[in-house]
């Protein structure tokens, strides 16, 4: 398939404004235009902790001209290479999610796309299959990728790469993952060897371009995944600089849970008459997600948090700072709970290992900062706990997006002390959510009914690395140690705002 667009994008002005981007644990396609904008699901009852209305303060979806191509109900109905269809079957993927069935007929035909929806809606394959199908059969020159996926965090970059890798292999396309915190030399080598598809965080990709290790002039398909998070993390200047370097007539796809001012600017500046598929940011909440605000007393919050963590099953707990995360993790381990910390102060290898342990169940409680957990996708996770309430309704929606993914059920629980109640009410109003509100104390039946809380064993536990990881570290050590100066030189001089913020 030829990824070049027939419309002349370069004739359109690009002068639009660019984006700018209290507990003891707390810290204070043939068709070239898009479908008419579709709104999210209608509101449901307001008293059962579900999401009754659209998020306040968002911009309207763009109005486009030509209707979208009709949605499909089976991948076999799509104009995709047979190898991709076979790979879908091999991966056990049989029926497209709504966002896939709606957007793929159009993106396979080369149209720009705007997908508005929460994580877990199936958007990775929605953009990934179109990107791979339209790039198949081409070969990239050294340092000149043909397709680009920009994401806000390293973890999300790795998850996108892992999700698309079997499909890329099926059509003989090479992928490279370009993120901070990893060897920039190895990433440069991968680009020099030729990679048709690059999945990148903005900061590291800019570093490689500045070094002369990558050029974007041949990129014909560009995807921005979780664009609102990139804006929140301050990446908009880098994102716009990168988008200005790709082929001006190329295809653009943008996916975002919310459509705020910065994302709206990206849509107006870089998308040409996009096909629009809108899933309410918490559409899963309408039928599968419950929202609970638990009023707790400050003196009891520590014990309440510990009992929730001791539940059967996995849970992600959010706190505001790295110090608070480490403090709670240590307390949970001492109480007999298999917990691990995730924040920007941890080495990338340690974060990757922690995520693997959490996904496999070796760790049952992931204690994380808001930024560090962005982009984490874990299947069958049914509880997210805001130990420290978020300060922004978008952060609340992103935290909640870790559960009730892909139609699964889940709950978001926020612990609120008396002095936080007014702010939490305002936040929920801004998010368009009417939660179930309950006064709870540790050890009470209501807490157990809502969260599965139970008394911890009290027997301290230690989380050790899996045997394979220990063997790998042993092999690395046997090859000799580098000097501190040498090791320091291996760290990129340009660290992304992720580490500073997490």
Task: Please report, for each region that a protein language model flagged, where it lies by residue.
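N-terminal intrinsically disordered, low-complexity tails of helicases
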Residues: 1-102, 320, 500-502
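Intrinsically disordered, low-complexity repeat segments enriched in small/polar residues
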Residues: 7, 31, 330, 465-467
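Compositionally biased, intrinsically disordered low-complexity regions
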Residues: 19-24, 42-45, 49-51, 115, ...
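Conserved helicase RecA-like core
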Residues: 70-459, 489-490, 498
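Long, compositionally biased
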Residues: 456-474
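The feature captures the C-terminal accessory region of ATP-dependent helicases
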Residues: 471-502
């Amino acid at each position: 398939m030829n990824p070049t667009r027939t419309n002349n994008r370069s004739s359109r002005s690009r002068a639009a404004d660019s984006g700018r981007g209290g507990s003891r644990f707390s810290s204070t396609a043939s068709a070239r235009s898009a479908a008419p904008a579709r709104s999210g699901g209608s509101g449901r009852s307001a008293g059962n902790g579900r999401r009754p209305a659209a998020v306040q303060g968002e911009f309207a979806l763009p109005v486009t001209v030509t209707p979208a191509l009709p949605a499909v109900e089976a991948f076999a109905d799509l104009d995709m290479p047979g190898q991709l269809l076979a790979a879908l079957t091999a991966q056990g993927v049989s029926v497209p999610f709504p966002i896939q069935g709606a957007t793929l007929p159009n993106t396979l035909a080369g149209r720009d796309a705007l997908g508005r929806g929460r994580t877990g809606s199936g958007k990775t394959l929605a953009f990934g299959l179109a990107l791979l199908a339209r790039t198949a059969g081409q070969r990239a020159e050294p340092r000149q990728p043909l397709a680009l996926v920009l994401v806000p965090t390293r973890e999300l970059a790795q998850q996108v790469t892992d999700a698309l890798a079997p499909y890329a292999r099926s059509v003989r396309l090479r992928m490279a993952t370009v993120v901070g915190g990893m060897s920039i030399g190895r990433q440069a080598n991968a680009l020099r060897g030729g990679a048709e598809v690059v999945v990148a965080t903005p900061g590291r990709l800019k570093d490689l371009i500045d070094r002369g290790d990558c050029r974007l002039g041949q990129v014909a398909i560009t995807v921005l995944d979780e664009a609102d998070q990139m804006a929140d993390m301050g990446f908009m200047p880098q994102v716009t600089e990168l988008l200005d370097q790709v082929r001006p007539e190329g295809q653009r796809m943008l996916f975002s849970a919310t459509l705020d001012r910065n994302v709206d600017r990206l849509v107006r500046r870089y998308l040409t008459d996009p096909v629009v598929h809108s899933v309410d940011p918490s559409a899963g909440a309408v039928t599968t997600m419950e929202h609970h605000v638990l009023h707790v007393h400050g003196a009891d919050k520590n014990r309440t948090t510990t009992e929730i963590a001791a539940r059967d099953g996995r849970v992600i707990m959010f706190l505001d700072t790295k110090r608070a995360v480490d403090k709670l993790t240590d307390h949970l381990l001492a109480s007999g709970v298999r917990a691990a910390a995730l924040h920007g102060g941890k080495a990338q290898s340690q974060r990757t290992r922690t995520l693997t342990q959490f996904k496999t169940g070796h760790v049952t409680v992931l204690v994380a900062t808001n930024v560090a957990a962005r982009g984490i996708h874990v299947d069958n996770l049914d509880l997210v706990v805001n130990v420290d309430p978020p300060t922004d309704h978008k952060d609340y929606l992103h935290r909640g997006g870790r559960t009730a993914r892909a139609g699964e059920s889940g709950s978001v629980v926020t612990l609120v002390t008396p002095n936080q109640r007014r702010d939490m009410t305002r936040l929920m109003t801004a998010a368009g959510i009417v939660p179930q509100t309950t006064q709870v104390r540790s050890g009470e039946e209501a807490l157990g009914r809502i969260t599965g809380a139970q008394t911890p064993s009290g027997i301290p536990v230690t989380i050790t690395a899996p045997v394979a990881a220990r063997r790998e570290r042993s092999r690395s050590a046997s090859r000799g140690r580098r000097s501190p100066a040498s090791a320091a030189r291996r760290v990129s001089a340009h660290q992304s705002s992720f580490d500073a913020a997490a």
